[in-house]
Amino acid sequence: MRKDETSNTSPDISAAQPASALRYQLRPPRRNDGAAIHQLVSECPPLDLNSLYAYLLLCEHHAHTCVVAESPGGRIDGFVSAYLLPTRPDVLFVWQVAVHSRARGHRLGRAMLGHILERQECRHVRHLETTVGPDNQASRRTFAGLAGERGAHVSEQPFFDRQAFGGADHDDEMLLRIGPFTHPPH
């Protein structure tokens, strides 16, 4: 068991977070969370559902840069998958932000992202990068809010166009770059 799995303390969620976000325990995912995470993502369109194996690997190999939001009843209602870029370790790449419909509207996604950035393993991160589809306004609001909390700039550029996805019906993906992070949230 990793030392960070034993903590039952509540996360330090910014005062800007609604009280309803406080009911969730934010923690690194565990290997046995893989199936619940897979189920959660399947219930969060338009997110791309990856294989259960991929979520198990994220729980096992990238727990230090991923987070789950667990309800008092033990249900996983939120998940963020992220990793440090191997060639630029001061950049956190966020792969997916999943928040179940029953937990939306409470800035849980932003709280989970902030929780990852506050971990000791991510204190050196100066930029966050992620991709979003052009019509995903909820994700854009989440990342803009995080940038505002941290006094950071958001830039956008093309990343993957629809041709990169082969014959799949997939929108273009734009790269959002947030940073530099110069101070903790207010």
Swiss-Prot record:
Top-level EC class: transferase
Domain N-acetyltransferase: 24-179
EC number: 2.3.1.178
GO biological process: ectoine biosynthetic process
Cited InterPro entries: Acyl_CoA_acyltransferase, Bact_Acetyltransf, Ectoine_EctA, GNAT_dom
UniProt-recorded Gene Ontology molecular function terms: diaminobutyrate acetyltransferase activity
Name used for this protein in its record: L-2,4-diaminobutyric acid acetyltransferase
Source species of the chain: Bordetella bronchiseptica (strain ATCC BAA-588 / NCTC 13252 / RB50) (Alcaligenes bronchisepticus)
Lineage: Bacteria, Pseudomonadati, Pseudomonadota, Betaproteobacteria, Burkholderiales
